[in-house]
Amino acid sequence: MQMSKSFLLITVGLASTSLQAQTLTRDNGAPVGDNQNSITAGENGSVLLQDVHLIQKLQRFARERIPERVVHARGTGAHGEFVASGDFSDLTVSAPFTEKGKVTPVFVRFSTVIHSKGSPETLRDPRGFATKFYTEQGNWDLVGNNLPVFFIRDSIKFPDMVHSLKPSPVTNVQDPNRFFDFFSHEPSATHMLTWVYSNLGTPASYRTMDGFGVHAYKWINQQGDVNYVKFQWKSQQGIKSLRPNKVTEMQGKDFNHLTNDLYAAIGRGNYPKWDLYVKVLSPEALSKLDYNGLDATKVWLNVPDRKVGTMTLNRLPENFFLETEQSAFAPSNLIPGIEPSEDRLLQGRLFAYADTQLYRLGANLFQLPVNRPLTSVNNHNQNGLSNNAQLSNGDVNYEPSRKLNLAEDNQFKAVETKLVGTVQQKAISKPRDFYQAGVLYRSMNEQDRSDLIANLAGDLNKVIDKDIKATMVSYFYRADKEYGSRLAEATDTNLSQVKNKAMM
């Protein structure tokens, strides 16, 4: 259809006048007269410092980035709800679990662990699975991964482990020579390495992976009874991962595949769901395990689980930075009825995660909408950068005081725990570094075993030091002889040397 020039001009004119334009302003609210040209000294003169609009735009642009998370930098989030499947008040007084059908709002952030913000989501890595429950008792963060165990059992090794897995300070490239050098001194990592080098280390979708709390926690009921629990999110979408050839194919097509898939599914109303299960052990039953039940490198074998609720993610963030990037998760964000166990890795995470969020977002991070509790916050924490809280306590910013009745509630005191022994600095008892890696390997079908060997060999064959390679293969041999023998063949490692190391 041919349209006249005058018709086009009239149409464009009508369209432009129909918009209710708002006046562009500076941050102080003052209107901007020209956003296209800087103020200069004459036609060809220098730009003037008095151009405050230009200066402010450049200043704000230079400050758009906040510190990147040291781990879990690349992530995506979604809002949703958790619905309890029963009344579990016999086990815990935690609000989400005390009434069948109770609805608790949640925000979930999925992430890669080691790689940086702009990295491909196809890279092999554990995946973070962090859930913030907004309860009437405060915010509870269940900060986990898509794999049930971790590389180390003591938080004192966490900085070293992350340093080895991060890019080299010389080349700025991740290097298997570095992280296998570290892991050759950490046989406890054998179990986790078997998990992460399986195809579960390259999930096809955030929707098609499970989540685990990794650590044991304590559930406490109204009577003060204590049980140890482990949490697992089971995907109602099933488990789907990328095989080695599909990883390369996907990276060539879409290295944002995890984010794009989640956004597309929720955007079209295909809301993903996960059932939350818990394994429960009494302190007595925990002590009778033939491994240390508080060891983050272990799963609780043959312990039955029970479903406690279902989570549905049904709303996407309106702004990535305000919601997903500024969301702050920490295992120390606990509510009544849930306490940390004595797990040595968890004990360190209680401090480290909260501290890194203070560094990244500042002391008033809980005033950010995505981190703000539904309950009123009543304490005497004050001031700091970007504090916009309306304090109503007047002159009283301390406790106790006769002027203000803001007191503790004894019913929420920490549970008492009996301690025996002496202050010490020793490794845990019953480490059993290799046993569960063997159980995992033998549970795999042949295709999954072959992919595991191929994935591991792909990185081990980049290791120059043959002693490091042989040591690593010996760990997998100790887990399962077939496992180690196949890996020795795939890495051209002398099997006799492997067997000798396995006997050491």
Curated annotation (Swiss-Prot):
CDD domains: catalase_clade_1. GO terms for molecular function: catalase activity; heme binding; metal ion binding. GO terms for cellular component: cytoplasm; periplasmic space. Its cofactor is heme. The keyword Metal-binding applies. Residues 1-21 form the signal peptide. The keyword Metal-binding applies. Heme binds at residue 353. SMART domains: Catalase. It comes from the Bacteria. Keywords: Heme, Hydrogen peroxide, Iron, Metal-binding, Oxidoreductase, Periplasm, Peroxidase, Signal. It is found in: Periplasm. The active site is at residues 72, 145. It catalyses: 2 H2O2 = O2 + 2 H2O. GO terms for biological process: hydrogen peroxide catabolic process; response to hydrogen peroxide. PANTHER family: CATALASE, CATALASE-2. Decomposes hydrogen peroxide into water and oxygen; serves to protect cells from the toxic effects of hydrogen peroxide. This is Catalase. It comes from Vibrio parahaemolyticus serotype O3:K6 (strain RIMD 2210633).
